[in-house]
Structure formats: C-alpha cells, structure tokens
Amino acid sequence: MVMKKLLFILSFSLMSFMTLAQDVVVIKHTNYTTHFSKSKKYPVMVQWETTNAMVTCPTPLKRKDNFKPDPQLPVETNIGNDYVKSGYDRGHVMPAADNLCQTPQIQDECFYFSNMIPQTHRLNAGDWKSLETATREWAVISSKVRVWSGAIGEEKKIGAISVPKQCWKVVQIAGKWKAYLFNNDLSNPDGFDNNEVPLAQIEKLTGFKFR
C-alpha cells in the first residue's frame, strides 16, 4: 500500500514536471533569457546581467515604448490588445532602463511581450520601479549584478493573459543574495526593502534553484 502511494506521488510529480516543461518556452535574446508560459501568457522567469557599462554612458538612448510580439513566439505573444483598458500596466521584467546604453535593437528586444507582466500601476510605478533603480545602482557600485525575476499564480484574466498574484526578483551582488516578493495588488508594505524575503522562500514558490 505504501509502495503504491509512493509510486502515485512520483508519477504525479513527473506528469506535473512534463506539463510545465511543455508549457514553458525558453527564448534567448541579446541581453536576457525569458522563460515564457504559453498558457499564462507571461514569463515565469527572466534572467539577465546588468553591468556598469550598460547603464552609464554620456548619451543614453531615448525610451521608445515599442511594445510588440516576440518574433520567436509570434502567436503566443500577440497579446497587446488584451492590455488595452485592462487597468494593468505592461510591466517590464528586465527593465527598459537597463538597456539605455545599448543599441536600438537591444532596446527594442526589451519591449517584447515575452518580457512583460500585467502589473498594477501602483506596483509597476512604485516599489517595483524603485527596486529596478536600486539594482542599477548596485551594478554601478559592484560593476555587475545577476538578476532573476518573474511572476507566479493567477489572480484573474485580462483577455488571454493571466494576471499573476505575485511578482518576485532575486539579485546576486558580489556573491551576496537579495530576494524580493510583491503581491500584485495594493497590499504590499511601502518600500521595496520591506518586501525582502529569504531566498529559500522564492525557491520554494517558483521551483527554481538559484544557488
């Protein structure tokens, strides 16, 4: 009886892993790699490095909000109209400002929908943006930071897109780790530093291992 139960659990876990593997598409762009969920229509994880040279230059590019489908996943990411009048921002995972000292092509890649999460404006323009700014400052100080970021869960749908319950970010700075978890609503405490959590909590929630 115990053996049958164990085999059932192992079989269920394997099926869940296979389903996830079939759903998530990994796409490599110049400055970031996105793990895009075809069912949720948002990236469960995006990973990149931000360096001092990427964010400090005498003539940074002007931001162009050229949101568009990812050419490597055109059908699944042709979701721009779903954001219209939805009440949610097209929240960057890898920030556009991390590419202002790059080429126009690299900046354009940052506006693919495979790098977007539906976020409340309060989060996107508030603590999420403040954490993005802090991460760039850490990159200047330490010359480079490694970043993993994404979303989990489903609060509701806007068109075909799942609105995630939570957004998270992990930053490695000179061998030290920082992890942050935000609810995608109005319930977060003010200040991104007040949303710092143990790295193990992010690993448990997402299933990703960072160390």
Predicted segment positions?
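Domain-level detector of nuclease and nuclease-like folds
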Residues: 71-211
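Short, His- and charge-rich active-site/binding loops that engage polyanionic ligands
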Residues: 27-89
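Positively charged n-region of N-terminal signal peptides that target proteins for export
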Residues: 1-6
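Short secondary-structure junctions
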Residues: 22-24, 210-211
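Short, surface-exposed beta-strand/loop micro-motifs that present aromatic residues
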Residues: 23-24, 31-36, 166-172
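Sec-dependent signal peptide hydrophobic core
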Residues: 7-14
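N-terminal signal peptide c-region/cleavage motif recognized by signal peptidases
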Residues: 16-18
